[in-house]
């Protein structure tokens, strides 16, 4: 895959011709030409080469060159800040300066009775020659229309410039022929005939057409420049210099000279130059430029930092981990540009029309002129109709309808931390009917947290937390880490634990201040005779809520329960509610047990739950759900990669620095489910904008061309002046681009407004559950009782180990009952099952 810069394209017909020319090169697999960015992406292999591709473009009448890969960001900024609008403005001003006196002399005295200079008052030939000179000057100033139009016509691919140049040249040549008639009459002394011919001059039309088209081109160029504002603002954020430490001294060098492994420092108020890892220091970093997150993120040793983010209040020393084109900022820019360079499926309609549009318009103009001549109208009248058809038609509006909306939409998404990898992803995301969400890390925070501290009689919360943190301080279990982390956050001091012992399948034991402390599951406390009915009931209630209750006892007496769970993110419920308001069904897909999954579903409002699914089986569930509508799968992009790939749209959430996730079509920089709804809303608004643009482009041409040809003359005697046709054409592209710019007003946190779509119809039982139910009726089952399981992580580990056995159809693990129920499609020996449990680190009691 290689990118090329293309020069000489002015409209959709040009890009279509370039695309056809490159497709004709042997070895070219795929080619996409972007009129908006004047670029081309080509996927090719031998015998095709970059030189052959450039030669094919050159033979088609355009220019092409491989994009320079060195100093890429600087080149991109230069290309985005094109001085094309300034060049067009100079031409426009010069044309207008000449057009005003031309219009005064040609039409002012006829329409408004304005006085003429004495030299013109009685000499029609002087008026004609004056118009000839001014019009010729305007045509020279705007010679690019004639050069481009003629070149395209000679290559058999007429474009918009061909239409403009033909219309203007026809008026100019006809007027010059009339001027010769005037000269002949004047030489023969027939001033009256010469004065009569004066009304047949169309020089002002030729000049006005070129000037008005230039007005439209200027407005279009300015508007197109604004479509890349989001990318340019990101580039502006990148610092130009970095302060690195080399040979023990601080040195300020250009940011692009920082290499991987360099140590750099960032002072308060400075932007971080490259991606890195904090070595020392601490600060709050504003990452809103990359993620759209307005709240600064705390950084400490070991934390990752990204280029173009702002260090607010601390001194950071960091090690460079990703530099140059590998930084998060560069990947974001690359992603947005790739999206703009690809074509949305909806653009194929405009592409097909653009390929035949200009020849069709030329044919219509010829037929219209001939028809009026045959009907008996004067040649000047017929010529005016043909010229009107040529100059009112606008292939540019068709060609720009989709890409400008894609460019603005993808840029706006990037500004808010939503990255669409392709134009197709931006179009298809809005058509989502079912959103499937992973639980851990997507709906929940992804790491266990203490949710409840419930001391027994005679103890308070702080003393219970102190005991638990002291006891768990030497444990490596994730649940222990949650307790010690909570103690640190609460500034609770801990005591030294002596003789720490892990009790597999039950908990831990240690000596604290010379007395025995134990902590773990209910079975451990019960075995010591310390579990009363109230504490048991309290623990069961916590378990029903999807939490893991941990019981603690000290010196032979129970001290309380601390519940730990992977808590639901604060915005998950609101995000699910918004998705429902948009007419989207929500499904949770998780490998966790059903009790925990249902608890999370209840908290968030999820429609359907599919639990106890192994990572490898998630793709199968997604495939079955696709029967009921378009599916978007939301996950972390790594463990869920097969499911993301299987879905119609794969959405990777919380990607952070890993923008280039291969499995995802859409990358969300933040770990916020709310951004899923924002991505769908942005896609829908972009698609609606494309529909509006295409409607305007087709409506304008379908209505404008017949009127220009004279369709209203028989019934209403309304004829369109060529100058009005040129004015309409000059505004059509501007209207399309301006409409696309409205997407800049998109707000990701704005609640959905409008009529909801009909939710996708899903069966009451999800496909996998249905299969399990049917299988249970016919398949063989075995139950293995297990010691050692303490939390949902343990059950997931056991489920994975047993699910991997040959002949095991499904596995249901119960933490409460300390057992696993296996559904088999063939006989599996008990010894094989117990061996798998033992290898997973747990103790099988019996198998039946």
Predicted regions and their residues:
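Flexible metal-binding regulatory segments at protein termini and peripheral loops
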Residues: 1-126, 249-250, 334-342, 747-848
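Conserved ATP-binding TGD loop and adjacent catalytic N/P-domain core of P-type ATPases
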Residues: 16, 432, 512-514, 538, ...
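Hydrophobic alpha-helical transmembrane segments
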Residues: 136-145, 152, 169, 205-234, ...
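Juxtamembrane coupling segments of multi-pass membrane pumps/enzymes
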Residues: 76, 182, 191-194, 207-268, ...
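ATP-driven catalytic headpiece of P-type ATPases
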Residues: 90, 309, 430-476, 506-587, ...
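Transmembrane helix-loop-helix hairpins at the membrane interface
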Residues: 87-241, 352, 717-722
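Conserved cytosolic catalytic loops of P-type ATPases
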Residues: 26-45, 50, 55, 200-203, ...
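Membrane-embedded alpha-helical bundles of multi-pass transporters
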Residues: 111-126, 154, 173, 412, ...
């Amino acid at each position: 895959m290689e990118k090329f810069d293309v020069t000489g394209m002015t409209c959709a017909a040009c890009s279509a011709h370039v695309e056809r020319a490159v497709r004709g090169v042997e070895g070219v697999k795929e080619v996409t030409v972007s009129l908006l960015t004047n670029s081309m992406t080509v996927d090719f292999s031998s015998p095709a080469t970059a030189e052959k591709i450039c030669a094919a473009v050159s033979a088609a009448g355009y220019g092409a060159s491989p994009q320079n890969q060195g100093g890429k960001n600087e080149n991109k900024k230069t290309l985005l800040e094109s001085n094309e609008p300034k060049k067009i403005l100079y031409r426009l001003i010069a044309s207008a300066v000449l057009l005003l006196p031309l219009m005064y002399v040609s039409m002012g005295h006829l329409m408004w009775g304005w006085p003429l200079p004495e030299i013109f008052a009685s000499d029609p030939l002087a008026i004609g020659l004056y118009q000839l000179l001014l019009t010729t000057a305007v045509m020279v100033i705007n010679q690019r229309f004639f050069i481009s139009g003629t070149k395209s016509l000679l290559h058999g691919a007429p474009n918009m410039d061909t239409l403009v140049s033909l219309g203007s040249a026809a008026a100019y040549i006809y007027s010059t022929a009339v001027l010769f008639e005037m000269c002949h009459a004047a030489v023969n002394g027939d001033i009256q005939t010469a004065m009569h011919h004066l009304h047949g001059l169309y020089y002002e039309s030729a000049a006005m057409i070129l000037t008005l088209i230039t007005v439209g081109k200027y407005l279009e160029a300015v508007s197109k420049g604004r479509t890349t504002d989001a990318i340019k603002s990101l580039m502006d954020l990148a610092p130009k210099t970095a302060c690195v430490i080399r040979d023990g001294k601080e040195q300020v060098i250009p940011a692009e000279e920082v290499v991987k492994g360099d140590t750099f420092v960032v002072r308060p108020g400075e932007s971080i130059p490259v991606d890195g890892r904090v070595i020392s220091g601490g600060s709050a970093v504003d990452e809103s430029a990359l993620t759209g997150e307005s709240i600064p993120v705390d950084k400490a040793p070991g934390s990752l930092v990204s280029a173009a983010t702002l260090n607010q209040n601390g001194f950071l020393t960091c090690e460079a981990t990703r530099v140059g084109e590998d930084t998060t900022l560069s990947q974001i820019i690359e992603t947005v540009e790739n999206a703009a360079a690809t074509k949305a499926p909806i653009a194929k309609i405009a592409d097909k029309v653009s390929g035949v549009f200009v020849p069709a318009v030329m044919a219509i103009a010829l037929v219209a002129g001939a028809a009026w001549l045959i009907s008996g109208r004067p040649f000047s009248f017929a010529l005016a109709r043909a010229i009107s058809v040529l100059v009112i038609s606008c292939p540019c509006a068709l060609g720009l309808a989709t890409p400008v909306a894609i460019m603005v939409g993808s840029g706006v998404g990037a500004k808010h931390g939503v990255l669409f990898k392709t134009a197709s992803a931006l179009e298809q995301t809005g058509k989502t009917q079912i959103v499937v969400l992973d639980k851990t890390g997507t709906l929940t925070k992804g790491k266990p947290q203490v949710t409840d501290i419930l001391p027994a009689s005679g103890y308070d919360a702080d003393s219970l937390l102190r005991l638990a943190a002291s006891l768990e301080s030497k444990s490596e279990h994730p649940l222990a880490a949650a307790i010690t982390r909570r103690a640190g956050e609460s500034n609770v001091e801990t005591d030294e634990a002596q003789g720490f012992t892990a009790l597999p399948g039950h908990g831990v034991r240690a000596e604290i201040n010379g007395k025995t402390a134990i902590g773990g599951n209910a079975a451990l406390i019960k075995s010591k005779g310390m579990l009363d009915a109230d504490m048991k009931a309290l623990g069961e209630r916590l378990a029903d809520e999807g939490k893991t209750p941990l019981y603690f006892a000290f010196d032979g007496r129970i001290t309380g329960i601390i519940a730990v769970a992977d808590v639901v993110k604060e915005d998950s419920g609101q995000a699910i509610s918004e998705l429902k308001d948009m007419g989207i069904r929500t499904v949770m897909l998780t490998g966790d047990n059903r009790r925990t999954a249902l608890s999370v579903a209840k908290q968030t409002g999820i429609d359907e739950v599919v639990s106890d699914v192994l990572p490898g089986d998630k793709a199968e569930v997604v495939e079955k759900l696709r029967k009921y509508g378009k599916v978007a799968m939301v996950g972390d992009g790594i463990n869920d990669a097969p499911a993301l790939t299987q879905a119609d749209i794969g959405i990777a959430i919380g990607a952070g620095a890993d923008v280039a996730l291969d499995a995802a079509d859409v990358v969300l920089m933040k770990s916020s489910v709310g951004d899923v709804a924002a991505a769908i809303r942005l896609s829908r608004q972009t698609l609606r904008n494309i529909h509006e643009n295409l409607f305007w482009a087709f409506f304008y041409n379908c209505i404008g061309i017949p009127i220009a040809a004279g369709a209203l003359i028989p019934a209403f005697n309304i004829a369109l002046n060529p100058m009005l046709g040129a004015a309409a054409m000059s505004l059509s592209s501007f209207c399309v681009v301006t409409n696309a710019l409205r997407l800049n007003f998109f707000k990701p946190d704005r609640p959905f407004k409008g009529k909801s779509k009909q939710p996708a119809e899903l069966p009451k039982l999800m496909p996998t559950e249905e299969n399990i139910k049917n299988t249970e009726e016919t398949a063989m089952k075995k139950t293995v009782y297990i010691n050692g399981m303490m939390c949902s992580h343990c059950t997931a580990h056991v489920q994975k180990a047993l699910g991997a056995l040959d002949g095991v159809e499904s596995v249901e693990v119960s933490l409460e009952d300390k057992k696993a129920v296996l559904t088999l499609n063939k006989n599996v020996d008990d010894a094989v099952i117990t061996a798998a449990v033992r290898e997973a680190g747990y103790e099988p009691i019996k198998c039946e």
